[in-house]
């Protein structure tokens, strides 16, 4: 039996720790041997959880790189705009890498990281976790089998629930593009555009156009008597659907890893601790209409492919529930379904039947957290981490494996979609 690969966590945030959980559930595959993070609380937590010494705790990727190669790989879960400054020194030191998506905030940094990986012959895998869910993996298998023929059109939709949108993209880390260096489309939908590129891998994108705006969450749309902080001066605290009390105090476990991160130094924070945090300077206590958000809350993308096929992706935020929907039309049939229902349908042309078609329901029977509110993504997270081990070992990875080179098309399409949106929908040429 092969020894587990060794890994150091760089950026001990929510996503990196989810992938590192494989070392707990499957210690024969992965062993966490160190951490690099500026937060002493997180360094201490990782040291205790994974059982390594204080000598393997570092304050930054740069400090880690100065010590030479101390493990087989790193799990890079730093913020999007930190990927260049953390990835380059570690790849140059000889580490292979599991790198969170989006792996770069713009085309220039994307190409620089790709060039570094190529120069060092590094094995770099991007965390496109939705590829690993039974839903999308199952659809990919049916397309590869040729059941629906050549793809003519692919339509994807992502509805972002009101509580996810408000927590992550209005009040949270990805609300302001100047601070997080990431657009809404890149932060939320590089998943979806990657899925489109993966399912259309027999051809290449050639042109992109896009429209979108910040439509709903701005000061002029606030109720007349709304305050500035929900728990401090707002008379609507008990009735507003975006009230910090209703979203975070009444539902303290939902998105807890974002909302309560400033309380992580307290072992068991009380409700009073949480109320005081939201009353203070926490962005999660702000009126939803009076934040410093500048990202869009809806956007549509149109893609033209070399084969003549077309694709569309629609992002809409503020819905009653999260939803990912897909509909693929081929020359012999269609595949369509909703990710949250964990089932899809294969509808094939059949002129001799009464309905002139044959429809097969594929029920994957996956339950649990499908949107990541508690960390899960329909089972994709653990499968991705295990596939990374196979990738690093040089074993044959799964159909879903996304090397950094496979991820370029999806990222580039997002950058160009945003450029098109910023220029009134002007089509952009895709040069891979």
For each of these PLM feature ranges, what is it?
Residues 13, 52-116:
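Beta-loop-alpha module in the N-terminal Rossmann-like domain of NAD(P)-dependent dehydrogenases
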Residues 1-52, 196:
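N-terminal Rossmann-like dinucleotide-binding module
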Residues 50, 295-432:
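C-terminal helical cap and adjacent loop that interface with cofactors, partners, or active-site loops
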Residues 130-286, 424:
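Predominantly a Rossmann-like dinucleotide-binding segment in NAD(P)-dependent oxidoreductases
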Residues 112-129, 149-153:
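Rossmann-fold dehydrogenase core element
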Residues 76, 99, 105, 124-126, ...:
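Hydrophobic residues in well-ordered beta-strands that form the structural core
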């Amino acid at each position: 039996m092969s020894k587990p690969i060794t890994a150091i966590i760089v950026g001990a945030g929510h996503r990196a720790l989810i992938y590192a959980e494989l070392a707990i559930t499957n210690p024969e595959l992965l062993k966490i041997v160190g951490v690099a993070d500026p937060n002493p609380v997180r360094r201490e937590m990782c040291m205790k959880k994974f059982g390594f010494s204080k000598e393997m705790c570092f304050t930054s990727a740069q400090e880690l790189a100065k010590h030479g190669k101390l493990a087989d790989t790193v799990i890079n879960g730093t913020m999007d705009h930190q990927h260049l400054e953390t990835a380059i020194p570690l790849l140059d030191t000889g580490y292979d890498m599991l790198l969170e998506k989006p792996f770069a905030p713009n085309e220039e940094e994307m190409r620089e990281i790709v060039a570094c990986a190529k120069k060092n012959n590094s094995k770099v895998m991007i965390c496109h976790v939705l590829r690993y869910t039974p839903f999308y993996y199952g659809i990919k298998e049916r397309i590869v089998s040729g059941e629906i023929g050549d793809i003519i059109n692919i339509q994807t939709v992502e509805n972002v629930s009101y509580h996810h949108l408000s927590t992550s993209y209005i009040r949270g880390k990805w609300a302001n593009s100047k601070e997080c260096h990431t657009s809404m489309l890149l932060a939320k939908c590089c998943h979806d555009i990657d899925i489109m590129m993966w399912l259309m891998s027999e051809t290449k994108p050639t042109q992109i156009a896009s429209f979108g705006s910040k439509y709903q969450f701005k000061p002029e749309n606030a109720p007349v008597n709304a305050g500035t902080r929900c728990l401090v001066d707002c008379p609507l605290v008990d009735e507003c659907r975006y009230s910090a009390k209703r979203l975070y105090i009444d539902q303290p476990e939902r998105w807890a890893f974002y909302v309560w991160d400033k309380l992580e130094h307290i072992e068991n924070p009380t409700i009073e601790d949480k109320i005081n945090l939201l009353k203070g300077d926490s962005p999660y206590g702000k009126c939803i209409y009076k934040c410093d958000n500048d990202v869009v809350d809806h956007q549509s993308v149109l893609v033209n492919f070399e084969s003549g096929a077309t694709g569309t992706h629609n992002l809409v935020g503020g819905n009653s529930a999260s939803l990912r929907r897909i509909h693929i039309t081929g020359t012999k049939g269609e595949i369509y379904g909703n990710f949250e229902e964990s089932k899809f349908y294969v509808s094939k042309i059949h002129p001799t039947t009464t309905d002139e078609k044959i429809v097969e329901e594929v029920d994957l029977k996956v339950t649990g957290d499908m949107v990541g509110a508690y960390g899960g993504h329909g089972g994709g997270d653990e499968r991705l981490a295990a596939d990374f081990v196979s990738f690093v070992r040089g074993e044959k990875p799964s159909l879903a494996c996304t090397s950094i080179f496979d991820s370029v098309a999806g990222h580039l399409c997002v950058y160009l979609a945003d450029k098109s949106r910023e220029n009134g929908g002007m089509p952009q040429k895709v040069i891979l």
